[in-house]
């Protein structure tokens, strides 16, 4: 499949991003033994971060769009594979075995795309300038799309498996006069 280089980059960014959040929070100090060299004292103590430029916003927007495009590409491939599985299932008995393979391939594409999107979103939330709520909404949308796909495939496969008509055994006690339970006339 290739493209393994970006996983290393995402892992590095995730380590850099979450390194501080995994450590216990430091207690605020009010001077004490360290004097004016303690954190929170000095000319930059109350300084705010520099304002975000238009170039930074454009970069963040492009990164978000590229990230979403990658997920949509995986999801499209999963839908395409599932559609081929549906067609294969309808063709012949030999196609039924192949259809399960196509459904599995579609599921792998959908799961891989959703997982890589969620991991990338968590790792690149800072450079994308996304709030926690925005990232959670993105992951929720991906989960909803994946669950919709899984439900559609599950219902379709269940419908195909239940397509067998059960014929009750005729022990001679049933009368053939008059309509049956469904209201159909008796066969002639």
From Swiss-Prot:
Coiled coil: none
Chain spans, region Disordered: 21-53, 168-188
InterPro entries, alphabetized: TMEM160 (IPR026801)
Main location: mitochondrion
Name listed for the protein in its UniProt record: Transmembrane protein 160
Annotated organism of origin: Mus musculus
UniProt note on tissues of expression: Expressed in peripheral sensory neurons of dorsal root ganglia (DRG).
Family under the similarity heading: Belongs to the TMEM160 family.
Superkingdom of origin organism: Eukaryota
A GO CC term assigned to this protein in UniProt: mitochondrial inner membrane
Record's bilayer topology term: Multi-pass membrane protein
Residue list for modification Phosphoserine: 48
Record field: transmembrane: 102-122, 135-155
Transit peptide start-stop: 1-96
Effect of a null allele: Homozygous knockout mice for Tmem160 are healthy and fertile and display normal motor function regarding coordination and locomotion as well as similar somatosensory thresholds for mechanical (tactile) and heat stimulation as wild-type littermates. Homozygous knockout male mice show a delay establishment of tactile hypersensitivity and alterations in selfgrooming after nerve injury. Conditional knockout mice lacking Tmem160 in sensory neurons of dorsal root ganglia (DRG) are healthy and fertile.
């Amino acid at each position: 499949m290739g493209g393994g280089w970006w996983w290393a980059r995402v892992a590095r960014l995730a380590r850099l991003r979450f390194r501080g959040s995994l450590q216990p929070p430091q207690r605020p100090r009010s001077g004490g033994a360290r004097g004016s060299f303690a954190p929170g004292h000095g000319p930059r103590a109350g300084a705010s971060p520099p304002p975000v430029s238009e170039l930074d916003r454009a970069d963040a927007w492009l990164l978000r769009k590229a990230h979403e495009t990658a997920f949509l590409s995986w999801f499209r491939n999963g839908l395409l594979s599932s559609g081929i599985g549906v067609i294969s299932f309808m063709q012949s008995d030999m196609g039924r075995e192949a259809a399960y393979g196509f459904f599995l391939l579609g599921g792998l594409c959908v799961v891989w795309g959703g997982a890589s999107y969620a991991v990338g979103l968590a790792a690149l939330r800072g450079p994308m300038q996304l709030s926690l709520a925005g990232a959670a909404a993105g992951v929720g949308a991906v989960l909803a799309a994946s669950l919709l796909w899984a439900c559609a495939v599950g219902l379709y496969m269940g419908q195909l498996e239940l397509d067998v008509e059960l014929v009750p055994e005729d022990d001679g006690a049933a009368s053939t006069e008059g309509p049956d339970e469904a209201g159909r006339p008796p066969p002639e």
